[in-house]
């Protein structure tokens, strides 16, 4: 089977991770201690993508939980699904990274990283045919951002040919957690551009908007936000966990979604949106799902795809859905919104189907888009970065941990390059002279 090893780092990563495991345990009929009491063989058929079977009919997640302070992990352990995880897979330090990327990447995190890699190696050895890794973390803090990116590059060294997917919570314009978020995020993006295969960008502000606008929650908690993220994560991994007519795995997804190696930052959406307690009572149809799925209000990253163009996108439908209906709807969307799709990648929408819907829904769809408008998000962080870096504000926290200012400059220019690459492909059209187009292409090849 094609197993995936899951890592969660830092406070944000661990909380999203915990919500994810709660969601998929429910879908596979597992209770809080990993005992199977489901009703359908389909739940068991590909259980071992994410779970190891232990003795006594118990299933244990292939998850490694990492943090530089014990607090969040104690909370996970005390939560409803805390008994699910393998106790040796909790790896934590005592000092904390204090929202300092350098602490997570170079000092505190670097001391702990070998211990984590050992646990990851042990999990990987328990797999028949490891497909890849997924990591949940935020980019604004110290541990998830600094140590998370360190882990990614370490795992890359050890398993160069496996897929690396990240679910990264990017800092949002209005909801700021710390002052140094732009620094941490820029340094992290600098790493992700080089080492990740696919990055699903999630943005707290967009999640807040969805909770307030669509779900009508007056004051959403982080629990509500994490519930949304876990719905998307469960959707993205559906094809791996359940049999379906059109399956896709992390590698197929990347092949279909990433036209140029550096441009692997995706926007995600989910439909129908429901709040934690309520399940949707009205019947949804494929046209409604497609409509809602392509609605900018449904995107979980605060950038509006109408300001850019889709290079590629992928839709994953779950439930009793007719293949033909889906194809028709997707074609319909594409022909109505031609301006939002680049014309030099024909058939750039990929569809996957899975016959098992999420709990409490008849059907659902998950959307993954590679849109050039994601540059807004990097631009915004970059502007905040530049504003502080020009005055060298807060730099001493980083240089004190042994970082060099050069690294900041490099990260800044790498992120600016990323933005202009997105812009270049947004403006590109078929009609441009072939020759000049090829010349533009070349430098990208040799960047490694």
UniProtKB/Swiss-Prot annotation:
Keyword Metal-binding appears in the UniProt entry: yes
Alphabetical GO biological process terms: microtubule-based process
Acidic residues compositional bias, start-end: 432-448
Entry cofactors: Mg(2+)
Keywords: Cytoplasm, Cytoskeleton, GTP-binding, Magnesium, Metal-binding, Microtubule, Nucleotide-binding
Protein residues bound to GTP: 11, 69, 138, 142-144, 204, 226
UniProt-recorded Gene Ontology molecular function terms: GTP binding; GTPase activity; metal ion binding; structural constituent of cytoskeleton
Keyword flag Magnesium: yes
Residue ranges of the region described as Disordered: 425-448
Highest taxon of the lineage: Eukaryota
Function: Tubulin is the major constituent of microtubules, a cylinder consisting of laterally associated linear protofilaments composed of alpha- and beta-tubulin heterodimers. Microtubules grow by the addition of GTP-tubulin dimers to the microtubule end, where a stabilizing cap forms. Below the cap, tubulin dimers are in GDP-bound state, owing to GTPase activity of alpha-tubulin.
Family from the record: Belongs to the tubulin family.
Binding partners and assembly: Dimer of alpha and beta chains. A typical microtubule is a hollow water-filled tube with an outer diameter of 25 nm and an inner diameter of 15 nM. Alpha-beta heterodimers associate head-to-tail to form protofilaments running lengthwise along the microtubule wall with the beta-tubulin subunit facing the microtubule plus end conferring a structural polarity. Microtubules usually have 13 protofilaments but different protofilament numbers can be found in some organisms and specialized cells.
UniProt cross-references to PANTHER family, sorted A to Z: TUBULIN
Official protein name in the record: Tubulin beta chain
Organism in which the protein naturally occurs: Aspergillus flavus
Lineage: Eukaryota, Fungi, Dikarya, Ascomycota, Pezizomycotina
């Amino acid at each position: 089977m094609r197993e995936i090893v899951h890592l969660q780092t830092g406070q944000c990563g661990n909380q999203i991770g915990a919500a994810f495991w709660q969601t998929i345990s429910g879908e596979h009929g597992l209770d809080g201690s990993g005992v199977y009491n489901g009703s359908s063989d389909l739940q068991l058929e590909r259980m071992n993508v994410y779970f190891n079977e232990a003795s006594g009919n118990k299933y244990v997640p292939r998850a490694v939980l990492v943090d530089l302070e014990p607090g969040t992990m104690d909370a996970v352990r005390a939560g409803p699904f805390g008994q699910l995880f393998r106790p040796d897979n909790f790896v934590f330090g005592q000092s904390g990274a204090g929202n300092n990327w350098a602490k997570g990447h170079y000092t505190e995190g670097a001391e702990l990283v070998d211990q984590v890699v050992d646990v990851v190696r042990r999990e990987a050895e328990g797999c028949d045919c490891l497909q890849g890794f997924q990591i949940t973390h935020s980019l604004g803090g110290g541990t998830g951002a600094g140590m998370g990116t360190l882990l990614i590059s370490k795992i890359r060294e050890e398993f160069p040919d496996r897929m690396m997917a990240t679910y990264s919570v990017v800092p949002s314009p209005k909801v700021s957690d710390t002052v140094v978020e732009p620094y941490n995020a820029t340094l992290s993006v600098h790493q992700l551009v080089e080492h990740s295969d696919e990055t699903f960008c999630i943005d707290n502000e967009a999640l807040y908007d969805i909770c307030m606008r669509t779900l009508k929650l007056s004051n959403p908690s982080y629990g509500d936000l994490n519930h949304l993220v876990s719905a998307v994560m469960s959707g993205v991994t559906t094809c791996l966990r359940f049999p379906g007519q059109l399956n896709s795995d992390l590698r197929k997804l990347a092949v279909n979604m990433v036209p140029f190696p550096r441009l692997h930052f995706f926007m995600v959406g989910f439909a129908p949106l429901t709040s934690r307690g309520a399940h949707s009572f009205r019947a949804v149809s494929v046209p409604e799902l497609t409509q809602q799925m392509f609605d900018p209000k449904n995107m979980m990253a605060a950038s509006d795809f109408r300001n850019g163009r889709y290079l590629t996108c992928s839709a994953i439908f779950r439930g009793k859905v007719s293949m033909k209906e889906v194809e028709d709807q997707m074609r319909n969307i594409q022909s109505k919104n031609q301006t939002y799709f680049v014309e030099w990648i024909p058939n750039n929408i990929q569809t996957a189907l899975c016959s098992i819907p999420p709990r409490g829904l008849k059907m659902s769809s998950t959307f993954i888009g590679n849109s050039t408008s994601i540059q807004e998000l990097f631009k915004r962080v970059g502007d905040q970065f530049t504003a502080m870096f020009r005055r060298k504000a807060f730099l001493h926290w980083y240089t004190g941990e042994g970082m060099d200012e050069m690294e900041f400059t490099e990260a800044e220019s790498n992120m600016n390059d990323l933005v202009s690459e997105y812009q270049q492909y947004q403006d590109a059209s078929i009609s441009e002279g072939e020759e000049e187009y090829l010349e533009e292409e070349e430098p990208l090849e040799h960047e490694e």
